């Protein structure tokens, strides 16, 4: 890890994250707050944005953050377009073996395909060990289609949006204006984001605030180890 350390903060169950960031220095525009989802972001922003005439920090979900830091000059395929490209990539013998007659037969299969290779990539996994017998045929078909799909993408300069989360597409220019990045109740950090945080620590202050007991989160490996539930009074 980098010489600079992540600052970890923990709050109790029932407490508000926004109440932890009430100081003037918490509300400067050089702060970037990142959230796991829109619900958490909306609650936080509603409480923090008191003075509409002053400059504010930036508030983004992790999905919005990803769209700004992973940049490629390739043609990015989203939603139905990436599934259509997948369909065109399926070798004829595979279509026959799987009884694929139309685009609509493979929508779920295609989404699983993109999700599988995304997980492999963001967690830096080269190969899956201990595959069950019933899984072997699926991985066989995935590998066959992947070979064909890669050729199509190379020919037309395509990339599915699922696969943009790659360190080779990571761009720091947009982040230059921020001095501090705060991850608000973000509890999952795939390998690629550990690398990105390590890179950002060279120039920025990084803070992670979680609604957990101190000791429940592995601060070295950035993952939950256990969950300590709050004590409740026995009913009378």
Model-found features: residue ranges?
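Short glycine-/polar-rich loops that comprise or flank the Walker A/P-loop
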Residues: 29-31, 54-57, 204-206
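Walker A/P-loop
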Residues: 2-21
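Short acidic, Gly/Ser-rich segments with clustered Asp/Glu that frequently serve as metal-coordination loops
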Residues: 185-192
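Conserved RecA-like helicase ATPase core segment
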Residues: 192-236
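Basic/charged alpha-beta structural segments of nucleotide/phosphate-handling enzymes
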Residues: 38-176, 191
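Flexible, charged surface loops at secondary-structure boundaries
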Residues: 1-3, 22-30, 171-181, 200-203
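Structural recognition of the conserved hydrophobic beta-strand(s) that form the central parallel beta-sheet
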Residues: 33-35, 182, 206-211
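Conserved RecA-like ASCE P-loop NTPase motor core of nucleic-acid helicases/translocases
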Residues: 28-41
């Amino acid at each position: 890890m980098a010489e600079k350390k992540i600052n970890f903060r923990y709050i109790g169950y029932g407490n508000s994250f926004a109440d932890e960031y009430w100081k003037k220095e918490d509300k400067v525009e050089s702060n970037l707050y990142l959230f796991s989802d829109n619900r958490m972001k909306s609650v936080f922003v509603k409480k923090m944005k008191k003075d509409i005439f002053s400059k504010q920090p930036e508030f983004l979900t992790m999905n919005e953050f990803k769209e700004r830091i992973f940049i490629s000059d390739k043609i990015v395929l989203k939603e139905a377009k990436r599934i259509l490209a997948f369909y065109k990539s399926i070798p004829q013998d595979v279509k026959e073996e799987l009884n694929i007659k139309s685009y609509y037969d493979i929508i779920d299969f295609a989404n699983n395909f993109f999700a599988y290779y995304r997980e492999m990539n963001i967690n830096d996994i080269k190969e899956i060990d201990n595959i069950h017998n019933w899984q072997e045929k699926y991985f066989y078909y995935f590998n066959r289609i992947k070979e064909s799909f890669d050729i199509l993408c190379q020919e037309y300069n395509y990339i599915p949006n699922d696969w943009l989360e790659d360190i080779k597409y990571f761009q720091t220019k947009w982040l230059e204006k921020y001095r501090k990045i705060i991850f608000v109740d973000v509890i999952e950090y795939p390998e690629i984001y550990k690398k990105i945080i390590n890179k950002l620590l060279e120039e920025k202050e990084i803070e992670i605030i979680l609604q957990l007991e101190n000791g429940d989160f592995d601060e070295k490996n950035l993952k939950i180890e256990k969950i300590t539930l709050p004590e409740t009074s026995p009913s009378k």
